[in-house]
A protein has these predicted regions:
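N-terminal Rossmann NAD(P)H-binding glycine-rich loop of SDR-like oxidoreductase domains
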Residues: 3-23
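N-terminal Rossmann-fold cofactor-binding loop
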Residues: 30-35, 50-51
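Conserved Rossmann-fold cofactor-binding substructure of NAD(P)-dependent oxidoreductases
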Residues: 45-65
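NAD(P)-cofactor binding segment of oxidoreductase domains
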Residues: 74-101, 140
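Substrate-positioning beta->alpha
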Residues: 81-86, 137, 155, 183-193, ...
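Conserved catalytic-site region of short-chain dehydrogenase/reductase
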Residues: 107-113, 160-163
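Glycine/proline-rich active-site loop of Rossmann-fold NAD(P)-dependent oxidoreductases
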Residues: 111, 164-169, 195-204
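Conserved beta-loop-beta element that borders a ligand/cofactor-binding pocket
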Residues: 142-163
Length: 210
């Protein structure tokens, strides 16, 4: 399939690119700084652009099958990059008839937050106080996705690690993860790529952890 990955040079994005290529997909990696992106492959197209420019975003969505958003937020930075990017991604997908959108959300925002224990919600609230900009950015992004008519899936991991891909983890919308729950970025990528044709979680916010 033809995949476009935003945030391809990020920690999870790099796993998405590598695993997608292993699976035989044709990958378009959208990056701002090509110097920060080392992978090279015959089925990899590296496009340099700015998620804040609608035409840049649209140029890598036309003709694709699936869009994956692996955009991260920077602590203490109020640039709203996730919201701005998604505000361009959604209409471009609608314009070109690309249906499947898979996003990395989080346990502290959206419906997934309701699955946290009382203590988990307390911890999430504390993190929100420490970095309200990041939480607001992800929340605004998820609202844009939820309000679209796309076949979206909002993947909600807890604490992320740099551990290996195992392919073995819990996932579902009704899980109640402990506050110590974690999962590797490699396994988040593994799960996301399994959603590109699976309809199980369309319009939902699956949680995954070990």
């Amino acid at each position: 399939m033809r995949l476009t990955i935003f945030g391809a040079s990020g920690q999870t994005g790099l796993h998405l690119v590598a695993q997608a290529l292993e699976l035989g997909h044709n990958v378009t990696a959208f990056v701002r700084d090509p110097a920060s992106f080392a992978p090279r492959h015959a089925n990899l197209d590296i496009v340099v652009g700015d998620v804040g420019v609608a035409d840049d975003v649209a140029s890598v969505i036309n003709g694709q099958d699936v869009v994956l958003l692996a955009l991260g937020v920077k602590m203490g930075v109020a640039d709203q990059v996730c919201t701005i990017a998604t505000a361009h991604v959604v209409p471009a997908m609608q314009q070109f008839g690309v249906r499947r959108l898979i996003n990395i959300g989080g346990m502290g925002t959206g419906p997934a937050r309701n699955q946290l224990s009382a203590f988990g919600k307390f911890v999430a609230g504390g993190l929100r106080l420490l970095d309200r900009h990041a939480f607001r950015d992800k929340e605004s992004q998820e609202v844009l996705i939820r309000n679209s008519d796309l076949d979206w899936i909002n993947v909600c991991p807890p604490w992320l690690t740099n551990g290996p891909r195992t392919g073995v983890y819990r996932f579902g919308c009704d899980l109640r993860p402990p506050v110590t729950a974690k999962i590797s970025r490699a396994d988040v990528a593994d799960f996301m790529l399994k959603q590109i044709i699976d309809p199980t979680f369309v319009g939902k916010d699956p949680i995954l952890y070990y």
